[in-house]
Amino acid sequence: MSNVASKPVQLSSDIKFNVTDNTIHIEGPKGKLEFVKPDEITIVQTDNLINESTKSESTAMSGTTRALLFNMVTGVSKGWEKKLSLVGVGYRAKADKLKLELVVGYSHPVNFEIPEGITIETPSQTEIVISGIDKQKVGQVAADIRSVRPPEPYKGKGIKYADEQIVKKEAKKK
């Protein structure tokens, strides 16, 4: 068994955990998530811990399953969040309930549809906060927004993650 899979996932008292056939249902204060587990992995709940047992040939999948379960439990209890910042003169963002409008140096504003289960806030014109209960979905939406105008290496203009360090290149010299 992998090192990751050997650690149990801790459940808090406000989280409901249920396994039916191969589908895992986790419900918490922020919402509910479902996950279809692989056939060769068996999930057992004892008190407030989730353990898994596996056959020897599927150790990699057991570690992945444990990580996905942990992300689901954390998502329905605390939620996930990614922060983006806009760097550049005149770059700004404005969020409504259904769309995010980005002005990032193109001749037109870029409209980004907000998927279901994701909330996007703009505390200031140059900050975007993406939050939700599904870690994969939050990360994918953040990557999609960043891909509208990724940071360029000479001046650092573009949309970047809040904690991302842009390594700047030196301009050509004659």
Language-model features, listed with the residues they occupy:
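N-terminal intrinsically disordered, cationic/polar leader segments
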Residues: 2-143, 147-161, 165-174
